[in-house]
Amino acid sequence: MEAPAQLLFLLLLWLPDTTGEIVMTQSPATLSVSPGERATLSCRASQSVSSNLAWYQQKPGQAPRLLIYGASIRATGIPARFSGSGSGTEFTLTISILQSEDFAVYYCQQYNNWP
């Protein structure tokens, strides 16, 4: 059995808008999981963003990669093990069967309100 690895998860990402800050809070900050396990990451908005929520994956030295948009729609080429759910203020990214290449930093971003 492979030793658990750290799946890094950004704790806080915020994007200001003209009506007030929307604060996106992600949890957990880090997640210790092993390949083959299920990983669940959560994102909470300080006010409703409807389904205007995206998830990104970033590996060292690489640009962020879009995984999910519209809260639950997989971007082109994203494996089916990645799924998104939620609306309003509560969102979840699930990796059903974690693979070694999935160990990365994950971000959520709202795009309901832009500056």
UniProtKB/Swiss-Prot annotation:
UniProt-annotated stretches for the region Complementarity-determining-2: 70-76
Sorted alphabetically, which PANTHER family does this protein's record hold? IMMUNOGLOBULIN LIGHT CHAIN
Q: Can you name this protein? A: Immunoglobulin kappa variable 3D-15
Region Framework-1, residue ranges: 21-43
Q: Where is this region: Framework-3?
A: 77-108
- Leader sequence residues: 1-20
Organism of origin is Homo sapiens (Human)
Encoding gene (name): IGKV3D-15
Q: Does the keyword Acetylation apply?
A: no
Biological process terms from the Gene Ontology for this record are: adaptive immune response; immune response
Q: Which UniProt keywords apply?
A: Adaptive immunity, Cell membrane, Disulfide bond, Immunity, Immunoglobulin, Immunoglobulin domain, Membrane, Secreted, Signal
- Assembly state and interactors? Immunoglobulins are composed of two identical heavy chains and two identical light chains; disulfide-linked.
